[in-house]
Design a protein with these regions (language model features):
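Extracellular/periplasm-exposed beta-strand and loop segments of Gram-negative cell-envelope proteins
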Residues: 40-63, 91-119, 149-181, 213-220
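Repeated loop/turn-to-beta-strand initiation elements of outer-membrane beta-barrel proteins
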Residues: 79-82, 135-136, 197-200
Length: 235
């Protein structure tokens, strides 16, 4: 019995350290995610540009973009989690039924739907608060995103009056875009523990830029509403 007590005393610190190590490892998780987004913009402008804004509001419409990337989560305590990610983002909006001319010398007139695309590398920094923490878990997310501008492009679907159709890709580079933009990110999420290490998450998220797309007479602030789906694994 004495030997058993002595062995227990000797091994107690080792077991404690091992348990602490396991607990520390279980606080980290890493995952991949993808979010299809309903994307658009708000405009801020002086009163004397109202007529230009009215023209834009008639011809511009929301469009679909996406975010995709990886994220690392750290469980601070039972209900609070910090999340850091890196994502590729496509923000968009669209001009519909724009009157255009032909290409390559074709003078036939027609109509075009033109999608404008803005590409970013985004670094979201979030705090997740778990309101339910069982096999199914729910949480509220809030934070900021640091967005680095990459490039812009357009895709046009043209229909000419003679019935011909054409799809044209182009890079504009017309505006002097703000290279680094900070945005707000917020939403709610629902998760499910598939196993001890794996969980699936579905997160409706709202993203809003705090700075305009470019320095221009009419300031454009991009935003999106999406449903992010992610698979995470505890390390």
């Amino acid at each position: 019995m004495k030997e058993l007590i002595i062995i227990s005393i000797l091994f107690a610190p080792i077991l404690s350290i091992a348990q602490e190590s396991v607990n520390k490892e279980s606080k980290f998780s890493v995952g991949v995610n993808f979010s299809p987004n309903y994307s658009y913009r708000t405009l801020k402008y002086p009163d004397n540009l109202q007529s230009f804004v009215d023209d834009r509001e008639r011809s511009e419409h929301p469009s679909f973009g996406f975010n995709t990337g990886i994220a690392v989560q750290y469980l601070l305590m039972k209900k609070f989690e910090v999340e850091l990610g890196i994502q590729f983002s496509r923000q968009t909006h669209m001009f519909k039924e724009v009157t255009v001319g032909g290409t390559m010398g074709n003078v036939s007139m027609g109509l075009a739907d033109v999608q404008l695309r803005y590409h970013y590398i985004e670094i979201p920094i979030l705090v997740n608060y778990r309101i339910v923490n069982q096999k199914f878990f729910g949480y509220i997310s809030a934070g900021v995103s640091i967005n680095q501008f990459l490039n812009d492009e357009s895709k046009a679907w043209l229909t000419y009056s003679n019935g011909d159709t054409e799809v044209v890709h182009s890079e504009s580079g017309i505006l002097d875009f703000n290279k680094t933009v900070v945005g707000l990110v917020g939403g709610v999420g629902l998760g499910y523990h598939i196993s001890e290490k794996l969980n699936l998450r579905v997160e409706p998220l709202f993203r809003y830029s705090l700075a305009p797309l470019a320095e221009a007479p009419i300031d454009q602030y991009n935003y999106s509403i999406g449903c992010q789906i992610g698979m995470n694994m505890k390390l």
